[in-house]
């Protein structure tokens, strides 16, 4: 797909929802292990690439070649899309190359015509992109060679034209924006990728708001308020993990 076929391509605006807000639900690698009943999740690049390619279609001709199979699903215009609380999915580790947990949310996503198979395909796509997160330093020829691994020409073109000098984790952002445009947005949902630096910024904002809410003024009282905040958020306070934030529109 030529990038000229796409109109109004713009870099996604920053997320305005703080991932530490009390109404945000959090999902971690431990939840994935509990759901799958596995102590170890294989998060190797080989596994990510394999599933990313399997979930794409190569049998048809035209603009659908190399794109996820879910993109061919027709949108149900008469469906009533039920809003749900934002879901924050933490990366499996502080190394984003290990990807994100694969957990489906039937009560929230089924009402948006997003099946377990669709969500699995998306997570596999993101995890495949995570495996390629270091390609920001590659040359153009090397990037284009990634098409053989299932990367669509759309993502590559978007990466080269829009992200190469303007964003961290360009391949991951390219994949997610493609899914938002082609699949999630028409179904009244949206996914943000929030890297660890952005998580740290949001945590600082959340801590400051907590301190202000407690009416702290001196250094000691601010320090105690910060300790209280960290204790309340001890399971999700790490800034080393990137996040996926799933919201309803």
UniProtKB/Swiss-Prot annotation:
Its main location: cytoplasm. Keywords: Cytoplasm, Nucleus. It comes from the Eukaryota. Signal peptide: none annotated. It is found in: Cytoplasm; Nucleus. The keyword Cytoplasm applies. This is Uncharacterized protein C1198.03c.
């Amino acid at each position: 797909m030529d990038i000229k076929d796409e109109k109004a391509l713009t870099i996604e605006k920053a997320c305005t929802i703080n991932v530490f807000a009390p109404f945000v639900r959090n999902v971690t690698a431990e939840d994935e292990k509990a759901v799958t009943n596995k102590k170890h999740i294989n998060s190797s690049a080989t596994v990510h690439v394999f599933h990313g390619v399997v979930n794409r279609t190569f049998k048809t001709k035209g603009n659908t070649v190399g794109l996820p199979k879910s993109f061919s699903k027709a949108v149900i215009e008469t469906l009533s899309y039920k809003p749900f609380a934002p879901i924050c999915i933490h990366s499996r580790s502080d190394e984003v190359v290990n990807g994100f947990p694969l957990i489906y949310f039937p009560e929230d996503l089924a009402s948006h015509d997003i099946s377990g198979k669709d969500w699995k395909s998306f997570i596999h796509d993101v995890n495949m992109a995570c495996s390629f997160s270091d390609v920001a330093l590659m040359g153009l020829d090397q990037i284009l060679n990634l098409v053989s691994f299932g990367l669509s020409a759309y993502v590559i073109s978007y990466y080269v034209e829009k992200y190469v000098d303007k964003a961290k984790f360009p391949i991951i952002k390219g994949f997610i924006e493609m899914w938002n445009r082609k699949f999630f947005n028409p179904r009244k949902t949206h996914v943000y990728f929030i890297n660890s630096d952005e998580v740290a910024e949001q945590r600082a904002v959340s801590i400051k708001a907590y301190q202000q809410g407690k009416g702290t003024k001196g250094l000691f009282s601010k320090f105690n308020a910060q300790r209280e905040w960290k204790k309340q958020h001890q399971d999700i306070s790490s800034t080393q993990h990137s996040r996926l934030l799933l919201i309803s529109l």
